[in-house]
Structures are given as structure tokens and as C-alpha cells.
């Protein structure tokens, strides 16, 4: 069995294989300030004839505010009030406006475990696959059903395995790797499949680097993006759950059946850039060098961790941000922000001319601060570059690694980080 088949077998209480339809028990459900209000409304619709309108298990639900925080409109403030009230009445854990982005906060708080079946009303919920969980995004209507029953139906997905070997070259990182894979298979290459990332390269990555990989599985159409749990996973979880021991069961068997397997050697991989207006429009940085920039956005659930921002800051050194360029730095969580603060990186970046914001989604969702105007060009370490994703539909967004973002912030144009 693949690890995905094992997880669905546990969740449904019976052995299953790819293609089977199952009613599965959910281990953890997450919603946030954008999709949560509709889920709550749907929950009360489902429960309208019930005398006691209670969620199935409040200990397995997490609500987090991260998209419009602090509230940037009256509507956002009203949504926050509604969700706070719901969380209090139901006894649900609510991470308010000060904690950070859902896909960073849940793992760092110990909510995600290997073998879990996790759903979130956000498309990048696949990020938790970095810890060996099967996690996937669902809509608010499905989330309402989960709130009420703790169950959801699935078609057990086929698995697309990516075997990656070789040591990543200097100043080439996991973001370059996942962009390369997406560029190779396309935005629908793994549609409704469990993307399973394996091989010596993947095993060499830290958990933050793995989070970047799993986070972007949806950008190749993946239902989930799983990396088998190992000693690196165990060490990460032991820091959050004292005495945690990894169960070796949660990995694919040697005889597991895959829909497809692709092999990659990344020993000579160059820094990669996703060009407007699709994530699979991927080119080597050498092909787009010199593209003038108005803004660089460093952050998001894809690359907003301490490791990421440190990479960018170290490349920039003591040099200032290029004239005419706005550098926005948005850490993924309060915990990551405090690490940066204690290490001196916040002061260093601000002295260089960066704007360091409180932890949140920031420009990534296109509805808060730091948006691009018509004709403007931005480089971002986030995960999507569709038209209008980070502001005007007439703007242009390129996606890159933190290293490329740092080098480009110095020069004011897309720059190969190996040349700085």
C-alpha cells in the first residue's frame, strides 16, 4: 500500500486502494477568517433541526485568523467577531490575529502528525504533508459537513511519486526544486493525485524546506503532497510533543502501486523562476535576468520561515534595497518573527529599507496590503502568480526562492543569486 492508502484505510476502518470511495473520519479540521464564516453558516443550516447545535468534536477543530489581519475592512472585522463567538460557544481553539499563517502555525504548535487525515478550507492545506499527513483543501460547504459529523467522503487518490536525487547546488533551494517539478509536469500533471516526494534529496531537506515542497503540491493539481516521515520529522515533533515516537508504519510499502514515477537528478539545477501568469511557466533565472522590478515580497506559507528570511538577508548583507523597489518582508508566524528579531534580522532588514510586517498572509491573497498596481512587476516567494493574485490584473508576478528574491531586491531586477 502507499502511505495515502494506509491513511485512508485507518480513517475509514477498512482496507482500501486507489479508486475506492470511502467515508473517512477526520483527525483535524482547520478553517480561517476568509472561508470560515461560510462554513459556520453551513454548519447551522445542517443543524437547523437539531436541539443541540454542537460540532462533532471541538478538540479536532482549529480556527485561525491570518488572511485579513488585523481587520482591514468592516466586513473583515465582522467576520472576526462571528468566528470568535462561534469558537467560544463551541469550545474550539481559536488562534487570533497575532499568531500567523495557518500552514505555519498548525505544524509549529504540534497539531499535525504522520498518518493523520487533515482537511482545511484553504487550497494549500497540502502543506501538512511535509510531516507525513494526508492533508487536503476542501470548500466551506464540505467543512460545514465536517463540523457537524467529523466525516467526509473521498475517492482514494492514485499516487504520483517523484524520486529526486543529487545534492542541490549552492544557492539553489527547495523552492527551485518544486518550481522545476511543477514546470515539468504542468499545473494538471498530478490532478487529484497524492504527490509523493521521495529520494535522497528530499530526505536531506529540513522540515521548513519540506514544507515549501508540500505546500505547492496543489500547483501541479495534487490532492496532497506527502513526504514520508523519518528521523527529521521525529526530531521536529519531539520539540513540540515531549516523548513523541515515530511509528514506522506511515510510509509506502516497497510493493506499493503508483500511477506514475518520475526520476530527477538536481545536481545541476539552476535557480528557477515561475513567470506570469501561471505557476508552471517556469524558466531558469538566466532566461529572465534583468527584468525590472517594482516590488519584492518575501514571505507567505511557502517561504516565510526563519530559514527563508535568513537566506535572503544573508545574501543582501549590509547593502540597501535598490532605489525604486519596495521590499516587503512578512514572517509566517509570531514564533518565526521572534526568531528573526532575536537574531537581529528584523533590524538589519529595516535598516536596508525593507518594510517588515506582522505575521499574516500579506500580499499573497491580493486583498490586503502591499498590492501591485497596473503595469507594476513583482517578484514573490509565495505560491501563485495568476492575474490579479497580488493586486491589479494588469500587474505581473514572478515567483522565486528567497535567495533569488534577496539578490533581486539589491539590484532592482531579477538577478541570479549565484552572481551576488
From Swiss-Prot:
[4Fe-4S] cluster binds at residues 301, 361, 364. The keyword Membrane does not apply. It catalyses: (2R,3S)-3-isopropylmalate = (2S)-2-isopropylmalate. Binds 1 [4Fe-4S] cluster per subunit. Pfam families: Aconitase. Keywords: 4Fe-4S, Amino-acid biosynthesis, Branched-chain amino acid biosynthesis, Iron, Iron-sulfur, Leucine biosynthesis, Lyase, Metal-binding. Pathway: Amino-acid biosynthesis; L-leucine biosynthesis; L-leucine from 3-methyl-2-oxobutanoate: step 2/4. Its EC number is 4.2.1.33. It is an enzyme of class 4 (lyase). PROSITE patterns: ACONITASE_2 (PS01244). InterPro entries: Acnase/IPM_dHydase_lsu_aba_1/3 (IPR015931), Acoase/IPM_deHydtase_lsu_aba (IPR001030), Aconitase_4Fe-4S_BS (IPR018136), Aconitase_4Fe-4S_dom (IPR036008), HAcnase/IPMdehydase_lsu_prok (IPR011826), Homoacnase/IPMdehydase_lsu (IPR006251), IPM_dehydratase_rel_enz (IPR050067), IPMI_cat (IPR033941). GO terms for molecular function: 3-isopropylmalate dehydratase activity; 4 iron, 4 sulfur cluster binding; metal ion binding. Its cofactor is [4Fe-4S] cluster. The keyword Metal-binding applies. It comes from the Archaea. GO terms for biological process: L-leucine biosynthetic process. Catalyzes the isomerization between 2-isopropylmalate and 3-isopropylmalate, via the formation of 2-isopropylmaleate. Heterodimer of LeuC and LeuD. Belongs to the aconitase/IPM isomerase family. LeuC type 2 subfamily. This is Probable 3-isopropylmalate dehydratase large subunit. It comes from Methanosarcina acetivorans (strain ATCC 35395 / DSM 2834 / JCM 12185 / C2A).
Amino acid at each position: 500500500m502507499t502511505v495515502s492508502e494506509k491513511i485512508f484505510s485507518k480513517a475509514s476502518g477498512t482496507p482500501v486502494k486507489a479508486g475506492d470511495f470511502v467515508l473517512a473520519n477526520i483527525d483535524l479540521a482547520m478553517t480561517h477568517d476568509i472561508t470560515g464564516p461560510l462554513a459556520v453558516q453551513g454548519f447551522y443550516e445542517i443543524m437547523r433541526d437539531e436541539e443541540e447545535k454542537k460540532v462533532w468534536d471541538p478538540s479536532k477543530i482549529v480556527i485561525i485568523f491570518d488572511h485579513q489581519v488585523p481587520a482591514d475592512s468592516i466586513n473583515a472585522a465582522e467576520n472576526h467577531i462571528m468566528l470568535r463567538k462561534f469558537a467560544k460557544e463551541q469550545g474550539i481553539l481559536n488562534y487570533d490575529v497575532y499568531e500567523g499563517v495557518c500552514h505555519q502555525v498548525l505544524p509549529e504548535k504540534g497539531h499535525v502528525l504522520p498518518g493523520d487525515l487533515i482537511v482545511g478550507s484553504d487550497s494549500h492545506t497540502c502543506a501538512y504533508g511535509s510531516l507525513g499527513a494526508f492533508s487536503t483543501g476542501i470548500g466551506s460547504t464540505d467543512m460545514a459537513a465536517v463540523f457537524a459529523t467529523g466525516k467526509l467522503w473521498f475517492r482514494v487518490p492514485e499516487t504520483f511519486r517523484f524520486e529526486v536525487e543529487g545534492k542541490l547546488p549552492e544557492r539553489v533551494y527547495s523552492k527551485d526544486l518544486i518550481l522545476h517539478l511543477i514546470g515539468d509536469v504542468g499545473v494538471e500533471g498530478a490532478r487529484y493525485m497524492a504527490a509523493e516526494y521521495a529520494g535522497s534529496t528530499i530526505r536531506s531537506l529540513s522540515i521548513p524546506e519540506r514544507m515549501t515542497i508540500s505546500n505547492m503540491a496543489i500547483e501541479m493539481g495534487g490532492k496532497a503532497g506527502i513526504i514520508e516521515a523519518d528521523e527529521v520529522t521525529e526530531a521536529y515533533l519531539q520539540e513540540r510533543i515531549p516523548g513523541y515516537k515515530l511509528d514506522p508504519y506511515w510510509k509506502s510499502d516497497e510493493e506499493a502501486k503508483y500511477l506514475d514515477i518520475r526520476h530527477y537528478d538536481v545536481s545541476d539545477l539552476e535557480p528557477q523562476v515561475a513567470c506570469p501568469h501561471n505557476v508552471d511557466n517556469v524558466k531558469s533565472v538566466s532566461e529572465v535576468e534583468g527584468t525590472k522590478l517594482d516590488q519584492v515580497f518575501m514571505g507567505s506559507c511557502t517561504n516565510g520561515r526563519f530559514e527563508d528570511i535568513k537566506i535572503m538577508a544573508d545574501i543582501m548583507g549590509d547593502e540597501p534595497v535598490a532605489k525604486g523597489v519596495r521590499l516587503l518582508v512578512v514572517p509566517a508566524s509570531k514564533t518565526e518573527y521572534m526568531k528573526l528579531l532575536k537574531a537581529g534580522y528584523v533590524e538589519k532588514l529595516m535598516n536596508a529599507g525593507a518594510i517588515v510586517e506582522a505575521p499574516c498572509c500579506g500580499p499573497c491573497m491580493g486583498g490586503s496590503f502591499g498590492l501591485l498596481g497596473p503595469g507594476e512587476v513583482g517578484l514573490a516567494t509565495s505560491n501563485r502568480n495568476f492575474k490579479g493574485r497580488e493586486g491589479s490584473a494588469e500587474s505581473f508576478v514572478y515567483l522565486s526562492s528567497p535567495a533569488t528574491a534577496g539578490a533581486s531586491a539589491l539590484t532592482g531586477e531579477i538577478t541570479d543569486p549565484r552572481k551576488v
